[in-house]
C-alpha cells in the first residue's frame, strides 16, 4: 500500500484517472480541475507547477488520487481510511507536499489530516456537496427571466466573478478565456429584471455524467429578491440539457440562506468537505 507522487499530469491521468472518474459525484472537483489542466495547459491555475498523486492498495489496485494547483489547496478524492493515514505520514516526508497552502477533503479525512500535519491548523471553509434529486421551481417566482450570457457581457462577468471571489476568499481574478469558454457552450446564464442583469449562475462542462453549478452571484444591493433562486433553477435546467445526468453544487455551510435556497429547488446533501489551512 503506497502513495505515488508526481508532477506529470499524463502519468496521473493514466494511473488514477479511472479510479477518480468511477466516483464522479464525490470527486467532481478533481475531475473538473484535471480537465482544465488538459484543455487549457498545465499553467491553467497559475505559474506554480501543479502536482498529483494516487493511492495503490494492498491488491495493487489504484483506489483514489489527489492533485494540487498552488496556491489552491490540495484536493483529495474519496479514498480508503488507510490512504488517509499514509497521506498524513507523507505530509512530513514528501517534498511535493512541503509548503501546502491547505487541504480540501471529505470532512472526516480533513480532520485526520489536520491532526497529522504537525502544525497548527484552522478550518478555512466548511462546504456541503449537493446533487439535484428533482428540480423544483422557485416559490415565489422572482420577477424577470434568464438569458444566456454573451461576449458583450464580458466586462460585467469579470466584475461579478471578481466580486464573488473576493467575498469567498478565492485566490486570483476572473479569466476572460475561461469566461469565453463557458459562454461558448451556454454555461453562463444571467437573470434580468426590467432589462438589466441582476444575478449570475454558471456550470462547468459535463465530465462523465456530472456537471457542477457555480459560481452563483447576486450583487449585495440586489439580494433578498429571489434572483439567485431564479437563475440557479435556470442554470440547473441548462446543465441537464447539456447532457449531464447528475447536476451538483457546493455551498458554504456558514451561509444558511443559500443552503435553504438550494434545498427548496430540489438539491439534496451528499457529503460535507472541509478546507484546513495553516493557522
Language-model features, listed with the residues they occupy:
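Short amphipathic alpha-helix that is part of the acyltransferase structural core
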Residues: 1-30, 135-171
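Conserved donor-binding loop and adjoining core beta-sheet/short helix segment
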Residues: 3-9, 24, 31-94, 198-211
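Conserved acetyl-CoA-binding loop-helix of GNAT-fold acetyltransferases
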Residues: 81-91, 214-220, 224-241, 259-264
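Conserved GNAT acetyl-CoA-binding A-motif
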Residues: 97-106, 209, 239-251
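Conserved beta-strand-loop-alpha-helix junction that forms the acyl-donor binding cleft
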Residues: 104-110, 249-259, 276-279
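Conserved acetyl-CoA-binding loop of GNAT-fold acetyltransferases
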Residues: 118-124, 263-272
Amino acid at each position: 500500500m503506497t502513495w505515488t507522487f508526481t508532477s506529470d499530469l499524463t502519468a496521473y491521468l493514466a494511473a488514477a484517472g479511472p479510479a477518480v472518474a468511477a466516483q464522479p459525484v464525490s470527486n467532481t472537483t478533481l475531475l473538473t480541475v484535471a480537465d482544465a489542466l488538459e484543455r487549457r495547459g498545465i499553467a491553467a491555475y497559475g505559474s506554480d507547477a501543479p502536482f498529483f498523486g494516487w493511492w495503490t492498495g494492498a491488491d495493487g489496485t489504484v483506489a483514489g488520487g489527489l492533485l494540487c494547483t498552488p496556491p489552491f489547496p490540495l484536493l483529495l478524492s474519496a479514498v480508503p481510511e488507510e490512504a488517509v493515514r499514509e497521506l498524513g505520514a507523507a505530509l512530513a516526508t514528501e517534498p511535493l507536499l512541503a509548503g501546502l497552502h491547505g487541504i480540501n477533503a471529505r470532512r472526516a479525512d480533513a480532520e485526520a489530516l489536520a491532526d497529522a500535519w504537525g502544525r497548527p491548523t484552522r478550518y478555512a471553509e466548511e462546504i456541503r456537496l449537493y446533487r439535484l434529486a428533482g428540480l423544483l421551481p422557485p416559490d415565489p417566482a422572482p420577477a424577470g427571466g434568464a438569458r444566456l450570457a454573451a461576449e458583450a457581457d464580458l466586462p460585467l462577468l469579470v466584475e461579478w466573478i471578481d466580486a464573488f471571489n473576493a467575498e469567498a476568499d478565492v485566490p486570483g481574478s476572473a479569466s476572460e478565456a475561461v469566461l469565453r469558454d463557458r459562454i461558448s457552450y451556454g454555461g453562463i446564464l444571467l437573470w434580468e429584471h426590467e432589462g438589466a442583469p441582476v444575478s449570475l449562475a454558471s456550470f462547468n462542462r459535463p465530465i462523465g455524467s456530472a456537471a457542477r453549478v457555480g459560481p452563483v452571484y447576486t450583487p449585495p444591493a440586489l439580494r433578498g429578491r429571489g434572483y439567485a433562486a431564479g437563475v440557479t433553477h435556470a442554470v440547473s435546467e441548462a446543465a441537464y440539457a447539456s447532457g449531464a445526468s447528475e447536476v451538483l453544487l457546493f455551498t458554504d455551510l456558514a451561509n444558511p440562506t443559500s443552503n435553504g435556497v438550494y434545498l427548496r429547488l430540489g438539491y439534496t446533501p451528499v457529503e460535507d468537505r472541509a478546507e484546513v489551512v495553516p493557522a
